Amino acid sequence: MPLDMEMIADQISRAFRGESWHGPSVREVLAGVSAEDAAAHPIAGAHSIWEIVLHLTGGYNLVLRRVHGERAQLSPEEEWPPVAECSAEAWRENQHTLEQLNQQLQSAVRAFPAERLSQELGSEYSAYIQFCGTPQHDLYHAGQIVLLKKALSASRVHRAEAPGRDDRSS
């Protein structure tokens, strides 16, 4: 069965928006996350939710640049950019940018000639590997976000149960 470009774009959409068998999508795991929680580092040495969103944004940008003919690589700063401004507005904007780039990537995949899937695309990796790798990458990081949210929740419970804490003064 030949692989249809619409099928690949659909997998990119499902990993980001939902309606898949695997569990929650990127958008689903980000729902309800505040800017404060997104910027938090509840696990020592791990990236924050916000940093992961910026990392995913960089990944989408990279593949889009390659689709448009660049032989692009990400610098370490582009791969894991720092959070520039920690505000609710900046958090909303970064999520919006991620969503827009996901939609652009889906459109680019739909328009991509299927006969070129096995050819290198701006790197040593084929278009097929990069297009199919995008939802894999999204879901890997969606799982990390789920764990970060659990760690945030556990740290709140731990703080609330800390001896000597008097919540009556709040």
Predicted feature residues:
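Short, contiguous alpha-helical
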Residues: 2-23, 27-30, 35-81, 120-170
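Acidic/histidine-rich alpha-helical segments that form the ligand environment
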Residues: 83-119, 129-137
